[in-house]
């Protein structure tokens, strides 16, 4: 989810972020403390617009499948007694679980917009308790929610937690509940008024003894896959290639950790069969590794270099770039470097088909070729983000206890499973190796515009600098122009 309440982009000067390096520990145990469950692709309308958000009986690894439909990742959980089913958007870029209530004006409208994600009714639960009325979260695009913090029973991945705190959106403009699993310091009640934090889901699992460390791994799988997986307290070596390499999370200039941000030290494009990479010149950039963002957002100047390398056409009205849908078959890869580990992203993961509009029409270029969204957008003045278009190509371990993220190339559609428990302490196994001399400071994004990038506005003539047959500009954008892209410039703030 783009941004949160620490609001990196409000600094008047470019701050430096720094950290000390510690190590992720992974322990092989006969009975690992890991909770795992699937995350799923869940069908929603206008998924890119929603960038607002954007089982283990005898073990302690908590596993959950992830739904993955139209670029949003969800998990299934229940709240209350008797259980009420919720599908919540998994978000490493925020920290609260919040859900809609059916009685809100938004959810009770004739279109029933909240039916897919589910709603929570406190009056129907015998274990509900009110905490306070202080829940208040909003996004720059105007969407958000206000309501109550409450406690109730939660059941996720077969694990039940009593008196678990979450929020109810009595007033909401989003149909989707969010399961934020970032730092407790990023919770809305902390960032809004400086209130004491509470144990969100990863911390509550540690507190209850279900996992040993406030850490989890994320495997989104490829764009066409219906499911991925999240493991709280563990990793699955069957889901990645090679070894995990560990880089530090960057802290703010105040010295605290509020978001899962690392130093992106290089971006390039792999063009040759020899594996050589043409790197775009850039200083290290602070980027959030954010599963709640469908697209990825790079500094304007860097995004411009990427666009020029793939002949993308930028539509400033929507803050989106377009490419021919046939580019999904291009064999080039964008390569993202983090001091040492790299994520190589194929074009088939970056080219997003919007599908037809309500009238069955599809976006096309003037030459008749079908137009698709390119999965990289300019960050403007907001913090840069690597969202699902990049994270699908990586296996990631978020270690909130040690303020680290471990990275390895993913194994798409792997059916192999070898679960290891994440323990406590330092340097316990070779599966996660600290990167020597990792970059520990980086610049926050600055808005510079997109110099040298071909632009196109729906309905305009092709740019005169290119022949009409070369100009790759969409004739129209499927309803996006009217609503904008909610993910652009998003951040949390108190209403």
UniProtKB/Swiss-Prot annotation:
GO annotation terms (biological process): proteolysis
EC category: hydrolase
Name of the molecule in the record: Probable aspartic-type endopeptidase OPSB
Top-level taxon of origin: Eukaryota
Alphabetical list of SUPFAM superfamilies matching this protein: Acid proteases (SSF50630)
Gene3D superfamilies registered for this protein in UniProt: Acid Proteases
Proregion span(s): 468-495
